[in-house]
């Protein structure tokens, strides 16, 4: 999913990209929306949310997401300078 950018270019910005032996979680932003992409062996999830906070909250209910990957993804996201907990 690419988001429109002035001048006809599409820009997707990675806010967080967490990888463990159990899978991967990415938070992407552009066009005023946040995309949550999570995947692991035998499963995958993609959803779009109005805010980063909504996407982070929704991560808790992604089916088959291992607890350790969930915790690491949130920890990585909170360490990002653009995340202030109220996005």
How would you name each of these model-derived features?
Residues 2-8, 41-87:
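Mixed-charge, Lys/Arg-enriched low-complexity segments
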Residues 12-14, 21-23, 37-39, 52, ...:
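Short, well-ordered helical secondary-structure segments
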Residues 24-50:
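A short, structured beta-strand/loop element
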Residues 2-31:
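Short N-terminal "domain-start" leader segments
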